């Protein structure tokens, strides 16, 4: 008998033996095994469903805690730390093949710098792969001021809905206003944010109609639409420009950079006010492309310094187009939303005037100091004017540059340091303190109560971190004083604290003792610091992103 036949015969004997032992015919054996398999699958399914419900319950409880009970500082700190670490892991796993990748600390530094929109660089951007650039795009989107404030608005809205569901007995936010009823002119209403305001005038509501106001939910949709529309339109505009301008397109071809990746990266970076570009020299190759610079400037302003006035303008336009009274209500009562970026009309005008005045002041100073400087050689008057305007807009928060910052005069650098120190929403005109959002007042009195004893002055904080940086870099300060001078260190700390990203860089030509192994790099001055110094700058970037909670 052949071996295969022997095996088949043995299997048949085993099957018959099992059937005899069970006192069942051969046809019943597969059915019994099938039923047992079904019971096992059902048991495992029940276990998985039970575990999934436990996980869902834990997630729901954690979400409720974050939304309703946790301090905003803790929420944002956890958010930035977790996303930064996730970005670091993604950058580490997507290293370009065939090239020596950056150190882990430099990748972590890059992730933190991108998420906090600081654009402090310790690696050369052109060394990153296309997939790593897309990771940075996601980090910039998630770290931008518009996106993070939008998440906070979602939390506020969820908290309001939760309170409404838990207190069904309370009156809802509805008004039954009759057009000819004078008794209703002095009524008060209760909003979902828990505050009472006087009723709107009769010409802003419809006759004999019940109107429900949910300002938080309405504003969530507006901010989300603003965010999505601005990012998409900015990317499309830059892509169209590179389709038209062959010279700009050739710059990317010479660097072997994908045009679409560059356009989307630049649009997101500009809107998020990060300051990174896929090029080592940032925007310097396009300093003569004044049309491109003019296209990028509105994107930078729309993502930060002028976001509040533009948001109010969007609400006003939607109200005019749709004719809905809820938009007029939001404009009249911005504090009801609890959104810090929505101000009354007067404050919005003050912000526009302050931003415009500061930009024009910078342009005047830089033109007087740098018009005939070496950094602007080869540019005509229009290119110089637009370039300096672009530089002035970026000094406040974004950090993109068409110039080598280290070649500018000391007076210009001092001006940059002062402007970087100023918060992005600072207004130099007097504003009414009563216009502060009501939710912010609650936050000041309740949420920040635990942290009030830990608040420190901004200047004291900068002095402390500068002192720590001088300690970690003391060897370089003594051996390389021209590069590691006090002003360069202070400038770097202020840039990290302001989440701007300007840097004086490092030059091998400034070494007291020439070193043949020294190579100039395009990344920032902090890239030459020790690991301890880089960790200090990471803390400064986190602190700068969260300074509104713990600094005064």
UniProtKB/Swiss-Prot annotation:
In what way does this protein cross or attach to the membrane? Multi-pass membrane protein
GO annotations under biological process?
sodium ion transmembrane transport
Q: What is this protein called?
A: Cation transporter HKT1;1
The record lists the catalysed reaction(s) as: Na(+)(in) = Na(+)(out)
Its transmembrane ranges are 71-91, 133-153, 222-242, 291-311, 349-369, 402-422, 449-471, 524-544
Q: Which organism is it from?
A: Oryza sativa subsp. japonica (Rice)
Its annotated function is as follows: Functions as a low-affinity sodium transporter.
Question: Could you tell me the superkingdom of the organism this chain comes from?
Answer: Eukaryota
Q: Which GO terms describe its cellular component?
A: plasma membrane
């Amino acid at each position: 008998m052949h071996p295969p036949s022997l095996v088949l015969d043995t299997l048949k004997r085993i099957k018959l033996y099992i059937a005899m032992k069970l006192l069942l015919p051969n046809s019943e054996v597969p059915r019994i095994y099938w039923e047992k398999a079904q019971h096992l699958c059902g048991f495992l399914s029940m276990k998985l469903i039970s575990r999934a419900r436990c996980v869902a319950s834990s997630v729901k409880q954690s979400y409720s805690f974050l939304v309703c009970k946790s301090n905003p500082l803790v929420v944002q700190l956890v958010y930035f730390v977790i996303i930064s670490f996730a970005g670091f892991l993604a950058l580490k796993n997507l290293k370009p093949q065939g090239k020596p990748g950056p150190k882990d600390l430099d990748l972590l530094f890059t992730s933190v710098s991108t998420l906090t929109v600081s654009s402090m660089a310790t690696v050369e951007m052109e060394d990153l792969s296309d997939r790593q650039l897309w990771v940075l795009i996601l980090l910039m989107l998630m770290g931008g001021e518009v996106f993070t404030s939008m998440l906070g608005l979602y939390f506020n809205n969820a908290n309001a809905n939760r309170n409404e569901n838990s207190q069904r007995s309370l009156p809802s936010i509805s008004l039954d206003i009759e057009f000819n009823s004078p008794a209703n002119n002095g009524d008060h209403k209760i909003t979902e944010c828990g505050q009472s305001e006087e009723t709107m005038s009769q010409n802003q509501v419809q006759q004999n109609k019940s109107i429900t106001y949910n300002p938080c939910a309405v504003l969530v949709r507006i901010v989300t639409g603003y965010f999505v529309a601005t990012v998409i339109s900015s990317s499309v505009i830059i892509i169209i420009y590179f389709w038209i301008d062959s010279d700009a397109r050739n710059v990317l071809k010479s660097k072997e950079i994908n045009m679409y990746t560059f356009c989307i990266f630049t649009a997101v970076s500009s809107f998020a006010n990060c300051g990174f570009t896929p090029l080592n020299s940032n925007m310097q190759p396009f300093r003569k492309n004044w049309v491109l610079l003019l296209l990028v400037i509105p994107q930078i302003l729309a993502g930060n310094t002028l976001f509040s006035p533009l948001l109010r303008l969007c609400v006003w336009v939607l109200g005019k187009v749709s004719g809905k009274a809820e938009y007029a209500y939001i404009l009249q009562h911005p504090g009801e939303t609890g959104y810090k970026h929505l101000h009354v009309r007067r404050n919005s005008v003050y912000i526009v005037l302050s931003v415009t005045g500061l930009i024009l002041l910078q342009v005047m100073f830089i033109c007087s100091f740098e018009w005939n400087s070496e950094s602007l050689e080869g540019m005509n008057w229009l290119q110089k004017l637009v370039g300096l305007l672009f530089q002035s807009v970026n000094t406040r928060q974004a950090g993109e540059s068409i110039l080598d910052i280290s070649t500018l005069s000391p007076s210009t650098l001092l001006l940059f340091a002062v402007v970087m120190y100023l918060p992005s929403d600072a207004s130099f005109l007097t504003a009414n303190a009563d216009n502060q959002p009501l939710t912010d007042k609650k936050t000041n009195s309740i949420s920040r109560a635990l942290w009030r004893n830990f608040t420190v002055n901004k200047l004291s904080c900068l002095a402390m971190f500068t002192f720590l940086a001088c300690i970690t870099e003391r060897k370089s300060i003594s051996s390389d004083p021209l590069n590691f001078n006090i002003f360069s260190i202070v400038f770097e700390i202020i840039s990290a604290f302001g989440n701007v990203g300007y840097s004086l860089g490092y030059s091998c030509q400034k070494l007291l003792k020439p070193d043949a192994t020294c190579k100039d790099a395009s990344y920032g001055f902090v890239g030459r610091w020790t690991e301890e110094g880089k960790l200090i700058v990471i803390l400064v970037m986190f602190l700068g992103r969260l300074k509104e909670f713990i600094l005064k």
